[in-house]
C-alpha cells in the first residue's frame, strides 16, 4: 500500500497499482455534524424506524466522531448517517391523494431528496474503533444504490457493498449484496474474518471499486475480491449503527442502569484513480 498524506491528519494507505486523488472526505473535526455532507437515516422501508435516531452524535475534539446509543421510550436506539438515501426508505406523503392527472396517487415512492454525495468507482476508506458490545449494537461502513434490486441486472440498479460490518467482538464481515432484499437476494465475495490487534485499537477498511470488480481491504491487507455483478451506477455512503431487536419487533429495553456504547470514526475518504 502507498502512503497518501492528508494535512493535519493521519495518512491513508492506498493500493499501489494506481495513482490517486482525494475527491471527498470528512475528517470529523467538528464541533458539529457537517450537514452539507451527511443526513440522518431515520426511515426504513417507507416509514420511520424506531431503532434510528438523530441523537447520540459526539465529537471528541480529536478529529473523531462517536456514534453513541441512547434511550427513547425506554429502549435503546442509535444513529445512522448517510450521504444519500434508498428510494424505498422514504415515507409516502398520504396527504397527496391525487397524481398530476387527477387520479388516485398510485406511485409507490415518497418524495425523493437531492443526495449530498453520490459516486461511482474509486477507493472508499474509513478508519474506526469498534463498539465494546457489537452483539447488542452493530456498526457498518458501506455503500448502496438508491434503486437496488429494481432491474434484473445489478449493473444498472446497483448493489450494496459492505466494506465493513461488525457483529461480533474482534471480527468483521465484508462483501456485496445484490438483487434487492427479497427472493432474488444474493451475495458475492462475502466473508467474515478475525481482526488482528492494533496498537491503538483502530482499524482501517477500504474498497477499491472499478469496472473490473471490487477488492476489499482491512488494515492494508486484501480480505476479499469479486469481479461479478459490478455496479455501474453512482452509490451513496453510509456510516451506521443499529441496536438489536427492532427487526424482530422485540427491541432491547433498558433494564436498570443505562449502558453506553459507541462506534468511533476518525475519517471517511473517497479517492479517484488518475
Task: Identify what each model region corresponds to.
Residues 1-274:
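GH16 jelly-roll
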Amino acid at each position: 500500500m502507498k502512503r497518501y498524506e492528508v494535512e493535519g491528519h493521519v495518512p491513508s494507505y492506498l493500493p499501489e497499482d494506481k495513482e490517486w486523488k482525494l475527491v471527498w472526505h470528512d475528517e470529523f473535526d467538528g464541533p458539529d455534524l457537517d450537514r452539507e455532507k451527511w443526513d440522518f437515516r431515520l426511515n426504513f422501508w417507507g416509514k420511520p424506524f424506531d431503532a434510528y435516531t438523530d441523537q447520540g452524535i459526539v465529537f471528541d475534539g480529536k478529529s473523531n466522531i462517536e456514534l453513541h446509543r441512547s434511550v427513547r421510550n425506554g429502549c435503546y436506539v442509535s444513529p445512522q448517517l448517510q450521504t444519500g438515501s434508498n428510494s424505498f426508505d422514504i415515507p409516502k406523503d398520504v396527504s397527496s391523494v391525487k397524481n398530476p392527472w387527477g387520479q388516485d396517487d398510485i406511485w409507490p415512492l415518497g418524495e425523493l431528496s437531492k443526495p449530498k454525495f453520490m459516486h461511482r468507482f474509486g477507493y472508499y476508506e474509513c478508519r474506526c474503533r469498534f463498539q465494546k458490545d457489537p452483539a447488542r449494537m452493530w456498526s457498518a461502513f458501506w455503500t448502496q444504490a438508491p434503486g437496488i434490486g429494481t432491474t434484473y441486472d445489478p449493473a444498472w440498479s446497483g448493489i450494496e457493498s459492505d466494506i465493513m460490518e461488525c457483529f461480533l467482538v474482534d471480527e468483521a464481515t465484508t462483501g456485496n449484496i445484490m438483487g434487492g432484499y427479497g427472493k432474488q437476494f444474493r451475495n458475492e465475495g462475502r466473508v467474515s474474518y478475525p481482526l488482528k490487534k492494533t496498537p491503538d485499537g483502530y482499524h482501517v477498511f477500504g474498497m477499491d471499486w472499478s469496472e473490473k470488480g471490487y477488492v476489499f481491504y482491512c488494515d492494508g491487507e486484501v480480505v476479499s475480491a469479486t469481479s461479478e455483478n459490478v455496479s455501474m451506477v453512482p452509490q451513496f455512503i453510509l456510516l451506521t449503527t443499529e441496536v438489536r431487536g427492532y427487526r424482530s419487533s422485540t427491541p432491547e429495553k433498558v433494564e436498570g442502569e443505562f449502558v453506553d456504547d459507541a462506534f468511533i470514526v476518525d475519517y471517511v475518504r473517497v479517492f479517484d484513480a488518475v
